[in-house]
A protein has these predicted regions:
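Hydrophobic, Leu/Ile/Phe/Ala-enriched alpha-helical segments that form helix-helix packing faces
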Residues: 1, 20, 137-141, 275, ...
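Bacterial Sec-dependent N-terminal signal peptides
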Residues: 1-30
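Short, basic/low-complexity N-terminal boundary segments at the transition from targeting/disordered tails
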Residues: 13, 22, 60-68, 123-135
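C-terminal, well-structured catalytic/ligand-binding subdomain of enzymes
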Residues: 32-81, 86-87, 94-122, 154-369
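Short, charge-rich binding segments
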Residues: 86-88, 142-143
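Intrinsically disordered, low-complexity linker/loop segments enriched in Gly/Pro
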Residues: 116-148
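An amphipathic, aromatic/His-enriched active-site/gating alpha helix that lines ligand/cofactor pockets
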Residues: 151
C-alpha cells in the first residue's frame, strides 16, 4: 500500500473538491455492510450490518406477512409495497444488500434492473435458511434484474454473501476460514468475483477494515451492535487521508468535505441484525435500527416475533407516510449540511456532531441511546 501524507490543509481540500466534481451519481446510492460470525461477537451470536446510502433519505419500518413467514423490513417512505431494503423474518432469516458495479455482463436495459428490493421482499416471505435462499435464486426467472451483493444469516449458523447478477450467483461463505479467516467479512459496492478494479466503495471498505482489524485482531475485542454503530456507521476515519476526525481536534474544528467516509449526506439508515446461535429460540432475533442519518440517530431494538407491535415513532403515522424518528433526525441534519447552493452540499459542519467541548449533537444523543 502507498499512502500520501498531506500536511497542507488547502492542498487536501483542493484535491477533494476536484474529486467530488467528478463523482458519478451512483456513489450516492451505495452502502457499506459486514457479517460478523459468533467467533468475534460478545455473545457468540452472528451480526449482519447494513449501512444504507440512497437517494431516498426517508425510511421507515414495516411489518409484512409473506406466503410462509412474517417479517420486519426497512422500506422507503413513501412506499408502494413489495420492496424491502433489508429485513428479518420470524424464522430467523435476515437479509441485506449492497449495490455492485462490477458484476453485470450483459446488455439488459436499465429499465429492467434495480430489482434488489423486490428480490429481498420475496425472499423474506419464503426463506428459512441459506439453502432456501439458494433454491430461491435458482428458481427466479432470468434476467433477475439485479447486480448486487446479498448478505444473509439464518438461525442454523449460516452466514454468507451472495454476489448476484442477472443470470448467476456466487456464494462467499463467511464460516469458511479460506473466505473469512478472522470470522468477519466486509462488503461495499464491488464484488470480489467481479471485474478487477471496477465498482465503488474501496475507500469505505478500507475504512471499515482498518477499524475492525484494530479492534478485533490487535486488541482482541469482541463485537456487539453498539460497537458496530459507533465504529462503523458513526466513524469518521478516512483510510486514504489517514485522518480520523473524531480524534484529530485541529482537522475537526469546523467544516470538512463529505467524501468517502462511511456516514455521508446520502446515508439514510443503519441496521444491525442480531441473529441466534443454532438451537436457540429464533424469537430472540433482534433488528437494531437507526433511521435517518446514523451519526444523529438513535439505535432502536425491534424483535421480529413482536413485529406487529413496532414502536410508533419507527412506522408511518396517521398524519404522515414518514416515521417520526426519521423526520426528527433529518430536521437536525439540516444544521449539519446547511449549504444548498453550488457544491455546498458536499461540505458538512463536523463540529456540530462532535467537538472537544462534548456538546456535539452525536455526543448528546449517545446518552439517550
Amino acid at each position: 500500500k502507498q499512502y500520501f501524507i498531506l500536511t497542507d490543509m488547502k492542498k487536501i481540500l483542493t484535491i477533494l473538491v476536484s474529486i467530488l466534481i467528478m463523482v458519478p451519481f451512483n456513489e450516492a446510492i451505495s452502502c457499506t455492510s459486514a457479517i460478523f460470525t459468533g467467533k468475534v461477537t460478545k455473545d457468540g451470536r452472528p451480526l449482519l450490518l447494513k449501512h444504507r446510502d440512497t437517494g431516498e433519505l426517508n425510511n421507515r419500518i414495516e411489518y409484512f406477512q409473506g406466503p410462509k413467514y412474517g417479517f420486519l423490513a426497512l422500506v422507503d417512505s413513501p412506499s408502494e409495497g413489495g420492496v424491502a431494503w433489508s429485513g428479518s423474518n420470524n424464522a430467523g432469516f435476515s437479509i441485506i444488500n449492497t449495490a455492485s458495479y462490477n458484476l453485470k455482463d450483459d446488455d439488459v436495459p436499465s429499465s429492467m434492473m434495480d430489482r434488489e428490493g423486490e428480490l429481498m421482499y420475496k425472499a423474506l416471505g419464503v426463506c428459512k435458511n441459506l439453502k432456501d435462499f439458494e433454491y430461491f435464486l435458482d428458481t427466479l426467472s432470468r434476467p433477475m434484474g439485479v447486480e448486487g451483493n446479498f448478505g444473509v444469516i439464518d438461525a442454523e449458523g449460516g452466514a454468507a454473501y451472495y454476489e448476484v447478477n442477472n443470470h448467476k450467483w456466487n456464494k462467499l461463505d463467511v464460516n469458511d476460514p479460506e473466505v473469512a479467516p478472522n470470522g468477519y467479512f466486509i462488503v461495499t459496492n464491488f464484488s470480489y468475483t467481479g471485474r478487477e478494479d471496477e465498482g465503488m466503495g474501496y475507500i469505505r471498505n478500507c475504512n471499515t477494515t482498518y477499524n475492525v482489524e484494530n479492534y478485533v485482531l490487535k486488541e482482541g475485542g469482541k463485537v456487539d451492535p453498539q460497537w458496530i454503530f459507533e465504529n462503523i456507521s458513526r466513524s469518521f476515519y478516512h483510510s486514504l487521508l489517514e485522518v480520523d476526525l473524531r480524534k484529530d481536534q485541529e482537522l475537526a474544528s469546523g467544516w470538512f468535505i463529505d467524501q468517502d467516509f462511511v456516514p455521508r449526506r446520502s446515508s439514510s439508515a443503519s441496521m444491525v441484525f442480531q441473529g441466534v446461535k443454532p438451537g436457540e429460540d429464533v424469537s430472540k432475533t433482534v433488528m437494531w435500527t437507526i433511521l435517518g442519518y446514523p451519526p444523529l440517530g438513535v439505535a432502536v431494538p425491534m424483535v421480529v416475533a413482536n413485529g406487529e407491535n413496532i414502536p410508533s415513532f419507527m412506522v408511518k403515522s396517521e398524519s404522515s407516510e414518514n416515521a417520526q424518528m426519521c423526520d426528527m433526525v433529518l430536521e437536525l441534519k439540516k444544521n449539519v449540511f446547511p449549504v444548498k447552493r453550488g457544491n455546498g452540499n458536499k461540505y458538512f459542519r463536523f463540529n456540530y456532531l462532535y467537538n472537544k467541548e462534548g456538546t456535539g449533537y452525536s455526543q448528546q444523543l449517545k446518552e439517550v441511546e
